[in-house]
Amino acid sequence: MGHRLEVTTPSDREIAMTRVFDAPRDLVFDCWTIPALLKRWMTGPDGWSFAVCNIDLRVDGQYRFVWRHEDGRDMGMTGTYREIVRPERIVSVELFDMDWTDGEARSTLVLTEKDGRTISVNTVLYSSREARNGAIAIGMAKGVEAGYDRLDGVLAEQVAAS
């Protein structure tokens, strides 16, 4: 527990988010792909809840996520899985309902296990430098870090139960 999120910009259109988790990558992969687990940690910033979490985990399968603010506003996103290599890699394209990223973004999640810990690298490729900079400006990293802190708790429960 207590690992920090490292955010880098490998290119003018990418954001890479790296984090270590004290759990085997099978469990981390499950927390990204099983709706009941994903809903426990990817809840969004304070004041938001994860209202819809539908996953068709197969190549060309879709996912649909909707976060709901306590004031009733919704923020939705639809994505399509392009590559799934359990438990090490997921590639998808995603598009928010209110398209603030100027088109689809490509997300590549790579999970590497070492000594019982998982190194997670999630790289998002945006359509333009401006879209990437917009994601940085709205504080995406802060929200991701809060979610990953919640994921630590979910993983600790899963490890204890196994």
Tell me the role of every PLM-derived stretch:
Residues A16, A36-D74, S162:
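Short beta-edge strand/loop motif at the mouth of beta-sheet-based domains
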Residues R25, L57-R58, R82-R89, V110-I119:
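A short, structured loop/turn motif at beta-sheet edges
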Residues M1-G47:
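Hydrophobic ligand-binding cavity/cleft-lining segments
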Residues L155-S162:
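Short, highly charged C-terminal tails/helix-capping segments
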Residues V91-E145:
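Beta-strand/loop substructures that line and gate deep hydrophobic ligand-binding cavities in soluble
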